[in-house]
């Protein structure tokens, strides 16, 4: 899907009626005329975080050399206040991924650096994309969206918290997964996420302020006054998001106690954490029901926690723990004001998945969902949901691949003799076995002028049957309890490095943005590839540009090996390299840098040397993994 396709159509852009009007959008794009506030935008982005910034990167690159100074003037709007990675939201520090994995696409591939990416630099790179879009004529409205509705003409009405109303043909919604689920809500009706935390009770809430903090509040407070937490008892509640809090507590010299309900923290492969791994072994308490009260003791503790374990008999006394601070990180709330579910309202019931139709992830598009959209969306019009919100909403969105595939088949049938297509149509609609349908197709006898149409239809039918069989297997394996399209959203991780294990991580948000927009990084044209994150299309384009003599089969084999290698976790990677060596003791395997940390410069050079030799006709059968071995 080419986001903002209508921007190429050069529709006239409305200006204030009291001002002279221009004939085309291009003319208006080069004027300073005051725009009509009631105009219909071609494209509106909601959100200013990473998912939107990745897409702005593609849009900026597409129009930067268009010959028009401000191609987005009057046509593109961006609505949003803060990037959730900004210092004023999540504090300082780092992101638990390398720059190679999460950085914006630029003129060159990022240099290899196994250390974690700086949060400030990542946020600044998002900001640079936003700034560039504004320089190209887009307006940035620092407001919060309160609701979206669809109009009779197919456009969308967007309500802002400042009272402003926008209309737009296309919307990209990238507001993230929502704020941390609150445990403070004792007045208004609870959201679904808040109801899941009704096992936690806060008593005398006014006295708890400043002592009971969500993860972001804790990060900001410890940035501002790290000495405040030194030597204090900090209770961290939450398995995975809590990892950041546990690591920070260790850095501050605090006494950390870690609460989880049933699952243990999942530490990412290749992590460089100093304190969280040990705390995950020694400081875990399995907690079900929890009551938190303020207390004043001689030793200065400010909180008293009464808790029970999962499955504990209600007649047993609760355990007691005194602490200075309680930090919670137990998921995000997609239904809070300003978040995707709250914004969408009734549109939630009209969403469908966006499949990997360009086959970026595999040759079976139905296995991977890269976003969500309002039904009937296309490159010119509609609502597209991207980023972390996709995984949050995916469980309530149903598959539509088979329906669309069948529609395409029925349309293709109109080009062929009715006497043959009628039976095929009946077999498909009645759910005939795949073997029976394929056998029938082979019996067709068509006129000499019709084979191309038959081949198209045959391909479509085979694709439909493969999808039908896949979804049936999924249904059987899950005993009918399919979780919407969640499994296919998670399949985005299957081509990423081993530290990317769930779809809301930045690695998959970046990858899905590229797949959705068809982005081709500038560094590919400059003779480089990022072997850590480039998708199959990017890798194939790079090979074609640099090594034109390499055939499709050889290129595909190389790409498959690159993707398979980078997806291995550290242990499996080392085992693979060792298993391929004739003399396992000949190389110092302990010094191997696994792909989860990125691709070192020496390995990049070795990959390019392999491709150069292949381009020259030399066939080296040595596995690519052997090129990761340190030189003697």
From Swiss-Prot:
SUPFAM superfamilies: FAD/NAD(P)-binding domain (SSF51905)
Biased composition (Polar residues): 15-32
Organism of derivation: Pseudomonas syringae pv. tomato (strain ATCC BAA-871 / DC3000)
Transmembrane segments: none
Entry GO CC: extracellular region
Disulfide linkage: none
Protein name: Effector protein hopAD1
Protein's cellular compartments: Secreted
Keywords assigned: Secreted
Region annotation (Disordered) ranges: 13-34
Highest rank taxon of the organism: Bacteria
């Amino acid at each position: 899907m080419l986001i903002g396709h209508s921007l190429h159509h050069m529709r006239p852009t409305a200006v204030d009626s009291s001002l002279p009007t221009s004939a085309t959008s291009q003319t208006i794009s080069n004027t300073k005329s005051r725009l009509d506030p009631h105009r219909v935008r071609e494209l509106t982005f909601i959100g200013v975080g990473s998912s939107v910034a990745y897409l702005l990167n593609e849009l900026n690159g597409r129009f930067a050399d268009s010959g028009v100074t401000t191609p987005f003037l009057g046509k593109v709007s961006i609505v949003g206040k803060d990037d959730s990675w900004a210092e004023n939201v999540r504090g300082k520090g780092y992101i638990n991924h390398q720059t190679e994995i999460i950085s914006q696409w630029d003129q060159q591939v990022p240099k290899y650096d196994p250390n974690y990416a700086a949060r400030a630099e990542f946020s600044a790179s998002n900001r640079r994309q936003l700034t560039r879009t504004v320089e190209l004529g887009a307006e940035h409205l620092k407001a919060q969206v309160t609701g979206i509705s669809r109009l009779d003409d197919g456009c969308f009405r967007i309500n802002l918290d400042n009272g402003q109303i926008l209309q737009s043909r296309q919307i990209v919604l990238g507001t993230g997964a929502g704020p941390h689920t609150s445990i403070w809500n004792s007045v208004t009706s609870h959201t679904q996420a808040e109801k899941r935390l009704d096992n936690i009770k806060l008593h005398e809430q006014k006295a708890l302020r400043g002592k009971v903090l969500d993860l972001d509040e804790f990060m900001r407070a410890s940035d501002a006054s790290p000495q405040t937490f030194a030597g204090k008892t900090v209770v961290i509640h939450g398995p995975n998001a809590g990892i950041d809090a546990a690591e920070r507590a260790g850095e501050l010299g605090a006494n950390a106690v870690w609460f989880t309900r049933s699952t243990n923290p999942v530490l990412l492969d290749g992590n460089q954490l100093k304190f969280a791994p040990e705390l995950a072994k020694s400081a875990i308490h399995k907690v079900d029901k929890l009551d938190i009260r303020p207390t004043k003791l001689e030793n200065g503790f400010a909180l008293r926690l009464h808790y029970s374990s999962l499955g504990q008999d209600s007649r047993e006394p609760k355990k007691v723990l005194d602490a200075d601070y309680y930090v919670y990180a137990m998921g995000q709330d997609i239904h809070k004001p300003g978040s995707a579910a709250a914004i969408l309202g009734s549109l939630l019931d009209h969403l469908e998945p966006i499949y990997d139709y360009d086959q970026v992830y595999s040759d079976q598009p139905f296995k991977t969902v890269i976003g969500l959209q309002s039904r009937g969306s296309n490159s010119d019009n509609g609502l597209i949901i991207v980023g972390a919100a996709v995984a949050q909403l995916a469980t309530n969105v149903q598959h539509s691949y088979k329906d669309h595939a069948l529609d395409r088949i029925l349309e293709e049938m109109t080009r062929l003799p009715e006497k043959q297509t009628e039976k095929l149509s009946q077999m498909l609609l009645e759910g005939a076995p795949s073997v029976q349908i394929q056998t029938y197709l082979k019996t067709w006898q068509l006129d000499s002028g019709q084979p191309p149409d038959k081949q198209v239809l045959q391909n479509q039918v085979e694709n439909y049957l493969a999808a039908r069989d896949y979804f049936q297997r999924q249904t059987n394996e899950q005993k009918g309890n399919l979780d919407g399209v969640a499994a296919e959203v998670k399949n985005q991780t299957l081509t990423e490095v081993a530290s990317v294990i769930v779809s809301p991580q930045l690695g998959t948000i970046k990858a899905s943005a590229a797949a959705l927009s068809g982005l081709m990084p500038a560094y590919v044209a400059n003779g480089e590839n990022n072997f850590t994150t480039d998708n199959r299309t990017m890798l194939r384009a790079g090979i074609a540009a640099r090594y034109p003599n390499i055939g499709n089969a050889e290129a595909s084999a190389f790409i498959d090996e690159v993707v398979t290698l980078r997806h291995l976790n550290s242990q499996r990677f080392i085992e693979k390299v060792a298993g391929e060596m004739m003399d396992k003791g000949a190389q110092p395997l302990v010094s191997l840098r696994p792909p989860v940390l990125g691709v070192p410069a020496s390995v990049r050079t070795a990959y390019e040397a392999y491709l150069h030799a292949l381009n020259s006709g030399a066939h080296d059968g040595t596995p690519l993994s052997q090129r990761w071995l340190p030189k003697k």
